Structure formats: C-alpha cells, structure tokens
Amino acid sequence: MAYPGSPILMKLLVFIFLSTFVVTNVSSETKCREFKSIISFGDSIADTGNLLGLSDPKDLPHMAFPPYGENFFHHPTGRFSNGRLIIDFIAEFLGLPLVPPFYGSHNANFEKGVNFAVGGATALERSFLEDRGIHFPYTNVSLGVQLNSFKESLPSICGSPSDCRDMIENALILMGEIGGNDYNYAFFVDKGIEEIKELMPLVITTISSAITELIGMGGRTFLVPGEFPVGCSVLYLTSHQTSNMEEYDPLTGCLKWLNKFGENHGEQLRAELNRLQKLYPHVNIIYADYYNALFHLYQEPAKFGFMNRPLSACCGAGGPYNYTVGRKCGTDIVESCDDPSKYVAWDGVHMTEAAYRLMAEGILNGPYAIPPFDWSCRSSGVKNSGSSDT
C-alpha cells in the first residue's frame, strides 16, 4: 500500500496528472482543426487528372474529351464528371486550392495539396486480382502503388523529414473512395457474389494498413469514404436488368441485392475504422458515408432540384437508363443532356457536379460524416456553387 507523502504515491499522482494532460490535449486538437493541405488517395471518384497524366497522348481515355469538364472548368481536366468532384468542394470549403494531380504534373506546387487518386485504381494489387482471374485493362495503380509514390516523392514535396511530418500532421488525408473497382472488375468477369464477398475483408484490411502506415508518418486526420449504392448505378442497372421486379426497390428503382453489398462493405469498413480509432486515440478517423449521401438523392430527387428520373445518365446513348455498355461519354456517338444540374448520374458510372456538391455538403456539414466534423473554430461553410457554370 502507498501512504501519503510516499515516493510511490507521488510518482503515481504525477503519472495521472500527465496522462490527463495528454488525453485532454489530444482531444482538443482533434475537435476542430485548420487543415493546411489535402493529401488524397483513391480512384476516379477523387481523380483530378492522374489517369490523364499517366495516359499515352496518342491513346487518351474518354474523359479527356468534351463534354467532360464542360461546366465550371469549360474544358476536360481529367475529372470523371462535367465539373467539380467531392474533393474539389472539400478544398474550396477549407480555403485551399483545388488539389493538383501528382502523376504527369510538371512544376506543380504540392505545398497545399497533392492527389494520387487514379481512375480505375484498386485497393488490392493487380497481380493479386489477376491470380484470381480478375483482369482489367485500365491501370496497374493500386492503393499500395499510390502510397509508395507518396513516400518516394516526399523529399521533393516538403523537403526535410521534420517539414514532411509537419505537413502530414496538418493535412486532411482523404482515403478514397477505394475498393469499388476491386468489386467492379470481379462483377465484370462474372464472378459469383459469394466469391466477390470474399474480397471484402481483404480490401478493408488493405485500406486499414495504408491508414496505419500514414499514422506512423504523422497522419492525424483521415476522411475514409465508403462505397456508393451500386444498385443505383446506371451501369449495373443496365448490365443486370431483370424482369423480376422483386429485385428492385419500389421507391428508388435501385437493385436491392447490389445495394446490400455496398451496405455490407460500409459496415465492415466502419468496424475496422472503430478498431483503429481505439488503437490510435490521438488520431481522428472519420467515416464518410458516401452510400447514404448519394442514396438520399435517389430517394428524394425533386427535393434537391433533380428531375424525376434520377437513374438516367446525363451523358449516355439510349436505353431505359440512357446508357449503353461499350458506348462511352466523350466519344462522338454519345451526347450530353442540356442541363446536367438536373441529373444525379453523369456518364453511367460517375455523378454530376450537382450531385457531388450535395454529397460534399452532407459530409462537411452533416449528417454523413461519422463522427461529424467540428468546425467551431471556423466561420465559413460549404459555398453553394449555384450554377455549375460559375
């Protein structure tokens, strides 16, 4: 037993005092922060031009051509939309420049942001997927490749190790969306749903490992998105069209079984993020509920200014969902709608700027960030872009 005034008791009291101070200090820092930059990883949902930068100039991908980028930028930028993406609206909210792509950039300034997200990227390594008969032509840039590019580029981005750690500590690190293409490519080669489900824990472990590595490098705040409700995807609604009406949600017209798959991914990802949060209490790990942020637009399209056919693509080529497999937006045989701001879906796979703006608002101002961001030390909110031509 320790008695009053004894050295053991004094040491115990000092330890308790310091422990309380440390916990309090960490908690106050993670409530509201002024981010100095954005570091982004992921796929086409966050790609601001990386796939374009990696492409052969003689064989450019379809999003390198109009009508991609026609609103806001007024020319293609390598983004898979008619305008800005969620990451762009986050940057605007934080008062930061739009995050430049890393790959193919020349003399770009990455001091306030750098983006490694590549259209078509997977969480798992290409060789791992190909060994399981899952082949894809788009890119060999996995999450691991992106992370390695980031580590190798640090001396040129931020200089000394101490400066780099400071940059990473004060950055909002956007981890995706990533993993959706792992599932997409498996569906595209007709893998069964049970076999595709086996990829889920592997995808989530890969995301978790990347977050853990970035925490070791100084990462303090992570925004980790879940998947879209793929049962509402124009591509999947077209490729998995069925006469069995019981497979469709009567309110939205989305495929219930595919949406359940997306929900399962989100549940497993959130459980893993909760585990990481307990392991690293000094870090702020925020789940971005892309699933419900987008699904809400399908549930009540008129409320958000969309037309009453939200499952129809703006840039498409006929059919019940204005989408034909193999006929891509950005080619001469596909036309764009007159007013993309009235559409949720852009090209059958990706969303319009109008949809992305609303999703960003739901993440930044609630209710689709878990736990929610605390902006009490800030005076500004998401800027309403109004017209997508502004």
Curated annotation (Swiss-Prot):
One Pfam family cited in the UniProt record for this chain: Lipase_GDSL
Transmembrane spans: none
Subcellular location: Secreted
Signal peptide: 1-28
Any GO MF annotation of the entry: hydrolase activity, acting on ester bonds
GO BP: any one term: lipid catabolic process
Coiled-coil region(s): none
Active site: S44, D347, H350
Sites carrying sugar chains: N140, N322
Zinc-finger found in the keyword field: no
GO cellular component, one term: extracellular region
Domain of life: Eukaryota
Keyword list, A-Z: Glycoprotein, Hydrolase, Lipid degradation, Lipid metabolism, Secreted, Signal
EC nos: 3.1.1.-
Family matches, as SUPFAM superfamilies: SGNH hydrolase
Sequence similarity: Belongs to the 'GDSL' lipolytic enzyme family.
Protein name per its UniProtKB record: GDSL esterase/lipase At1g28580
Source organism per UniProt: Arabidopsis thaliana (Mouse-ear cress)
Organism taxonomic ancestry: Eukaryota, Viridiplantae, Streptophyta, Embryophyta, Tracheophyta
